[in-house]
Amino acid sequence: MANIKSAKKRIKVIETKTLRNKVIKSKVKTLVKKVEVAVAASDKDLATKSLKDAVVAIDKAASKGVYHKKNAARKVGRLAKAVNSIA
């Protein structure tokens, strides 16, 4: 445990941010799974709707600093590619 007051404060802040990041990442993972399930079922309509929700969540996470900008772009690109592969 830290002895310095500022270090103790940083520990509290880090715990708060870690919790927030976990919640956001969990939500993104859930939305990504919805897209992947729809793609696996070849359901174009559901996949497209799910993709929109997932993209919004991923972009918000990137703007909050949960994901790096390029990591978010890569996730969105891969999901879009999967949805577009449905004939």
UniProtKB/Swiss-Prot annotation:
Family: Belongs to the bacterial ribosomal protein bS20 family.
Gene3D superfamilies associated with the record: Ribosomal protein S20
Stated name of the protein: Small ribosomal subunit protein bS20
SUPFAM superfamilies associated with the record: Ribosomal protein S20 (SSF46992)
Annotated GO MF terms: small ribosomal subunit rRNA binding; structural constituent of ribosome
UniProt-listed Pfam families: Ribosomal_S20p
Known function: Binds directly to 16S ribosomal RNA.
Record-linked InterPro entries: Ribosomal_bS20 (IPR002583), Ribosomal_bS20_sf (IPR036510)
Swiss-Prot/TrEMBL keywords: Ribonucleoprotein, Ribosomal protein, RNA-binding, rRNA-binding
The organism of origin for this protein: Lachnoclostridium phytofermentans (strain ATCC 700394 / DSM 18823 / ISDg)
A biological process from GO: translation
A GO CC term attached to the entry: small ribosomal subunit
Coiled coil spans: none
Keyword RNA-binding: yes
